[in-house]
Amino acid sequence: MSAKEVKFGVDARDRMLRGVDILANAVKVTLGPKGRNVVLDKSFGAPRITKDGVTVAKDIELEDKFENMGAQMVREVASKSADAAGDGTTTATVLAAAIVREGAKAVAAGMNPMDLKRGIDLAVEAVVADLVKNSKKVTSNEEIAQVGTISANGDAEIGKFLSDAMKKVGNEGVITVEEAKSLETELDVVEGMQFDRGYISPYFVTNADKMRVEFDDAYILINEKKLSNLNELLPLLEAVVQTGKPLVIVAEDVEGEALATLVVNRLRGGLKVAAVKAPGFGDRRKAMLQDIAILTGGQAISEDLGIKMENVTLAMLGKAKKVMIDKENTTIVNGAGKKADIEARVAQIKAQIEETTSDYDREKLQERLAKLAGGVAVIRVGGATEVEVKERKDRVDDAMHATRAAVEEGIVPGGGVALLRASEQLKGLKTKNDDQKTGVEIVRKALSWPARQIAINAGEDGSVIVGKILEKDQYNYGFDSQSGEYGNLVSKGIIDPTKVVRTAIQNAASVAALLITTEAMIAELPKKGNSGGGMPPGGGMGGMDF
């Protein structure tokens, strides 16, 4: 085990504080509509330019082990805020640095760190209660667009794309962000349920130009097993032919004489049919087939349930207004499932998302939820260069998470004003002793920093701006640093999702309180480099003359 270096008390906190400040100073310049860019060096390829706080924080690694520990703890604040709300990472970093800075002074002055922590916790509870009380529900598309615009650093186009996407796929729908191959940013919406399996044979194609199968008013057979025996299928095929409607078969696989017969019938025009492999694997496949069954009002045919293929009737098949199948994907639009059944399934999947501990499972469950609940929207971000596209994609990602958070918990005025107003509520907060009171005061001072920093980044005097905002009692009154004017921020469209502001202060205070109560730090000593000994003389190949 290698030797360790140990630092105590003031010495430990000073080194840690230096690391916190280095990281916070790099991140805070990105805050607000007039925040600056940060350029990150990459080991290969062009440098990356970003205005995303968490991206900057994740790129910082300091040489001094103790400084680095402080920086990494604050980086954790940014990461946690990004995970929980998808935005507010810079605000959280600024708050954490301010609380640590003031807290370290109080500890140095001889106050009890544990009481300071209790005071900080009391203050945060009061702030969260105030935010929730003043939060306003998001109802219109316009408000969703405003949230997206603010989070994308004032890019109204991104805000509009996001509100359009949410309008089309619903609040539960999946919105994914990809890099486009062109200059333009575009929105592509897939309505209904789509899964990543295409037709088994190209002979099923009905639209030769687009190389895809297009059926209207189709029956859908959902089967868990392989289909290779024709005799099993015959009774059902005859029943479907008499209705004159097309049939889509979703099964583990269709092969042998069953596939050959389907293809021949399709080519002769006797039966409109197409076969698709079932999506997913193992238990996930069972669940996805059940989703398709519920969406289309059919039954998943499984031997576990004691249903044999030859006994399947038309009533067991799903139905959909439109089915499109290309080489890679199958899309089912307007399934005939009952609304109540679909809602029950959605609630069940939501409960599973809450319970699961695996990120991979959570992601897959969310995909299933979106497919059932509305659809999938893809925003393809364009730009002139790769660097520009990456920078813009960062902002679209932030904005997407912010709009979701706004729909979830509502909105408060932006520009750091909600936290400023909450700081006023801390003035009369009751505490058990003076040290706890100082803890509350530390949070109260820190809450002015986001508004102050936004003003500083816009070239204004932070203290003057904060003073002027607090002179007025109106909750929504604040400073618009984009235009340099004061006014009602909500009516100007300068708003923050409550969830983003709430997670920022909770995460910042949680990590900052841990840093304040730190009394010792332990790090590995750097290894002393041994100077490598000379190489032994090489044995030449004897007796060889050149």
Curated annotation (Swiss-Prot):
Q: What SUPFAM superfamilies does the database record attribute to this sequence?
A: GroEL apical domain-like, GroEL equatorial domain-like, GroEL-intermediate domain like
Q: Which UniProt keywords apply?
A: ATP-binding, Chaperone, Cytoplasm, Isomerase, Nucleotide-binding
Q: Where in the cell is it found?
A: Cytoplasm
Q: Name one Pfam family in it.
A: Cpn60_TCP1
Indicate the principal place this protein occupies in or around the cell: cytoplasm
Q: Which InterPro entries does this chain map to?
A: Chaperonin_Cpn60_CS, Cpn60/GroEL, Cpn60/GroEL/TCP-1, GroEL-like_apical_dom_sf, GROEL-like_equatorial_sf, TCP-1-like_intermed_sf
**Gly residues bias: start-end ranges:** 530-546
Q: Which GO terms describe its biological process?
A: protein refolding
User: What is catalyzed by this enzyme?
Assistant: ATP + H2O + a folded polypeptide = ADP + phosphate + an unfolded polypeptide
Top-tier EC class: isomerase
Its family? Answer: Belongs to the chaperonin (HSP60) family.
Protein's recorded name = Chaperonin GroEL 2
What gene makes this protein?
Answer: groEL2
